[in-house]
Protein backbone atom coordinates (compact mmCIF):
# COMPACT_ATOMS: atom_id res chain seq x y z
CA UNK A 1 0.00 0.00 0.00
CA UNK A 2 1.19 3.47 -0.81
CA UNK A 3 0.54 6.05 1.88
CA UNK A 4 0.60 9.75 1.17
CA UNK A 5 1.72 12.35 3.71
CA UNK A 6 -1.82 13.01 4.93
CA UNK A 7 -2.42 9.31 5.64
CA UNK A 8 0.94 9.01 7.41
CA UNK A 9 0.10 12.02 9.60
CA UNK A 10 -3.32 10.64 10.55
CA UNK A 11 -1.86 7.22 11.38
CA UNK A 12 1.01 8.80 13.35
CA UNK A 13 -1.41 10.83 15.47
CA UNK A 14 -3.73 7.83 15.86
CA UNK A 15 -0.93 5.60 17.18
CA UNK A 16 0.58 8.41 19.26
CA UNK A 17 -2.87 8.86 20.81
CA UNK A 18 -2.96 5.22 21.93
CA UNK A 19 0.58 5.48 23.27
CA UNK A 20 0.15 8.73 25.23
CA UNK A 21 -3.10 7.53 26.81
CA UNK A 22 -1.55 4.16 27.73
CA UNK A 23 1.54 5.85 29.19
CA UNK A 24 -0.79 7.99 31.30
CA UNK A 25 -3.14 5.24 32.56
CA UNK A 26 -0.68 2.32 32.86
CA UNK A 27 -0.39 0.87 36.35
CA UNK A 28 3.05 -0.54 35.56
CA UNK A 29 1.81 -3.92 34.33
CA UNK A 30 1.31 -3.08 30.65
CA UNK A 31 4.09 -0.75 29.50
CA UNK A 32 4.43 0.24 25.86
CA UNK A 33 7.00 -1.84 23.98
CA UNK A 34 6.97 0.07 20.70
CA UNK A 35 4.79 2.15 18.42
CA UNK A 36 4.91 2.00 14.62
CA UNK A 37 3.24 3.47 11.56
CA UNK A 38 4.54 0.68 9.34
CA UNK A 39 1.48 -1.17 7.94
CA UNK A 40 1.19 -4.86 8.77
CA UNK A 41 -1.68 -7.08 7.68
CA UNK A 42 -4.95 -5.19 8.03
CA UNK A 43 -3.38 -2.71 10.44
CA UNK A 44 -2.01 0.63 9.21
CA UNK A 45 0.04 1.04 12.38
CA UNK A 46 0.21 -0.42 15.87
CA UNK A 47 1.02 0.24 19.49
CA UNK A 48 2.50 -2.83 21.17
CA UNK A 49 2.64 -3.61 24.87
CA UNK A 50 4.76 -5.99 26.94
CA UNK A 51 2.85 -7.31 29.96
CA UNK A 52 4.98 -7.50 33.12
CA UNK A 53 3.03 -10.60 34.21
CA UNK A 54 0.12 -12.74 33.13
CA UNK A 55 -3.05 -10.90 34.07
CA UNK A 56 -5.48 -13.55 35.26
CA UNK A 57 -8.12 -11.32 36.82
CA UNK A 58 -9.21 -8.08 35.21
CA UNK A 59 -10.07 -5.27 37.61
CA UNK A 60 -12.68 -2.71 36.63
CA UNK A 61 -10.02 0.01 36.70
CA UNK A 62 -7.76 -1.96 34.35
CA UNK A 63 -10.49 -2.77 31.81
CA UNK A 64 -11.66 0.85 31.81
CA UNK A 65 -8.04 1.81 31.11
CA UNK A 66 -8.00 -0.65 28.19
CA UNK A 67 -11.10 0.97 26.71
CA UNK A 68 -9.60 4.41 27.31
CA UNK A 69 -6.39 3.42 25.50
CA UNK A 70 -8.39 1.93 22.62
CA UNK A 71 -10.23 5.26 22.27
CA UNK A 72 -6.95 7.23 22.34
CA UNK A 73 -6.41 6.81 18.60
CA UNK A 74 -9.84 8.12 17.62
CA UNK A 75 -9.55 10.98 20.15
CA UNK A 76 -6.16 12.01 18.72
CA UNK A 77 -7.60 12.07 15.19
CA UNK A 78 -10.44 14.31 16.34
CA UNK A 79 -8.03 16.67 18.14
CA UNK A 80 -5.48 16.91 15.32
CA UNK A 81 -7.52 16.78 12.11
CA UNK A 82 -10.93 17.80 13.43
CA UNK A 83 -12.42 14.70 11.85
CA UNK A 84 -12.34 10.93 12.35
CA UNK A 85 -11.40 8.05 10.06
CA UNK A 86 -12.26 4.39 9.64
CA UNK A 87 -8.85 3.54 11.12
CA UNK A 88 -10.41 3.08 14.55
CA UNK A 89 -12.71 0.21 13.47
CA UNK A 90 -10.70 -2.48 15.25
CA UNK A 91 -10.30 -0.30 18.34
CA UNK A 92 -14.06 0.31 18.47
CA UNK A 93 -14.76 -3.42 18.09
CA UNK A 94 -12.32 -4.26 20.90
CA UNK A 95 -13.72 -1.55 23.20
CA UNK A 96 -17.26 -2.73 22.51
CA UNK A 97 -16.36 -6.35 23.32
CA UNK A 98 -14.70 -5.33 26.60
CA UNK A 99 -17.62 -3.06 27.56
CA UNK A 100 -20.12 -5.82 26.68
CA UNK A 101 -18.26 -8.25 28.95
CA UNK A 102 -18.21 -5.62 31.72
CA UNK A 103 -21.99 -5.20 31.48
CA UNK A 104 -23.14 -8.73 30.61
CA UNK A 105 -20.59 -11.01 32.29
CA UNK A 106 -18.62 -9.22 35.00
CA UNK A 107 -21.27 -7.11 36.77
CA UNK A 108 -19.18 -3.96 36.26
CA UNK A 109 -21.95 -1.51 35.33
CA UNK A 110 -24.88 0.33 36.85
CA UNK A 111 -27.11 -2.59 35.83
CA UNK A 112 -25.60 -4.56 38.70
CA UNK A 113 -24.21 -8.01 39.29
CA UNK A 114 -26.36 -9.85 36.81
CA UNK A 115 -25.24 -12.09 33.95
CA UNK A 116 -27.08 -11.20 30.77
CA UNK A 117 -27.29 -13.80 28.03
CA UNK A 118 -25.51 -17.11 28.09
CA UNK A 119 -22.55 -17.31 25.74
CA UNK A 120 -23.02 -20.04 23.17
CA UNK A 121 -19.82 -22.07 22.88
CA UNK A 122 -20.71 -23.90 19.68
CA UNK A 123 -18.40 -22.22 17.20
CA UNK A 124 -18.63 -23.77 13.75
CA UNK A 125 -18.29 -22.73 10.13
CA UNK A 126 -16.45 -19.56 11.08
CA UNK A 127 -19.29 -18.17 13.20
CA UNK A 128 -18.35 -16.06 16.19
CA UNK A 129 -19.43 -16.80 19.73
CA UNK A 130 -22.98 -15.63 20.10
CA UNK A 131 -25.12 -14.77 23.08
CA UNK A 132 -28.53 -16.26 23.81
CA UNK A 133 -30.85 -13.36 24.56
CA UNK A 134 -32.76 -14.48 27.63
CA UNK A 135 -34.00 -11.01 28.57
CA UNK A 136 -36.55 -8.47 27.40
CA UNK A 137 -36.15 -5.87 24.66
CA UNK A 138 -36.26 -3.19 27.37
CA UNK A 139 -33.32 -4.85 29.14
CA UNK A 140 -31.49 -5.16 25.80
CA UNK A 141 -31.84 -1.39 25.35
CA UNK A 142 -30.48 -0.80 28.87
CA UNK A 143 -27.52 -3.08 28.10
CA UNK A 144 -26.81 -1.24 24.83
CA UNK A 145 -26.98 2.11 26.62
CA UNK A 146 -24.67 0.91 29.43
CA UNK A 147 -22.13 -0.30 26.83
CA UNK A 148 -22.36 2.99 24.93
CA UNK A 149 -21.96 5.01 28.13
CA UNK A 150 -18.83 3.09 29.17
CA UNK A 151 -17.22 3.70 25.78
CA UNK A 152 -18.31 7.35 25.58
CA UNK A 153 -16.95 8.05 29.08
CA UNK A 154 -13.60 6.50 28.21
CA UNK A 155 -13.44 8.36 24.88
CA UNK A 156 -14.00 11.63 26.76
CA UNK A 157 -11.34 10.61 29.29
CA UNK A 158 -8.85 9.77 26.51
CA UNK A 159 -9.54 13.09 24.81
CA UNK A 160 -8.98 14.98 28.08
CA UNK A 161 -5.70 13.12 28.70
CA UNK A 162 -4.50 14.04 25.21
CA UNK A 163 -5.60 17.67 25.49
CA UNK A 164 -3.76 17.96 28.82
CA UNK A 165 -0.66 16.33 27.26
CA UNK A 166 -0.92 17.91 23.81
CA UNK A 167 2.81 18.60 23.47
CA UNK A 168 3.59 14.92 24.17
CA UNK A 169 1.06 13.97 21.48
CA UNK A 170 2.75 16.27 18.93
CA UNK A 171 6.27 15.13 19.88
CA UNK A 172 5.35 11.43 19.64
CA UNK A 173 3.52 11.86 16.32
CA UNK A 174 6.44 13.83 14.86
CA UNK A 175 8.87 11.14 16.04
CA UNK A 176 6.72 8.50 14.32
CA UNK A 177 6.65 10.52 11.10
CA UNK A 178 10.42 10.86 11.20
CA UNK A 179 11.43 7.36 12.37
CA UNK A 180 8.29 5.25 11.62
CA UNK A 181 8.89 3.18 14.78
CA UNK A 182 9.68 4.40 18.28
CA UNK A 183 10.47 2.50 21.46
CA UNK A 184 8.02 2.72 24.34
CA UNK A 185 10.58 4.48 26.54
CA UNK A 186 10.47 7.44 24.12
CA UNK A 187 6.73 7.96 24.62
CA UNK A 188 6.08 10.60 27.27
Regions inferred by a protein language model and the residue ranges of each:
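P-loop NTPase nucleotide-binding/switch module
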Residues: 1-5
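Soluble catalytic regions of large protease machineries
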Residues: 8-13, 19-188
Amino acid sequence: RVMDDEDRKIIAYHEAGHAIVQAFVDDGLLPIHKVTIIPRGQSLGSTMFTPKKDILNHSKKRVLNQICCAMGGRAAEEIEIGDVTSGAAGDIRMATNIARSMVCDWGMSDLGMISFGDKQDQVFLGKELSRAQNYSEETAQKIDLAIKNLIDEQFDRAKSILEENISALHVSAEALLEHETIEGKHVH
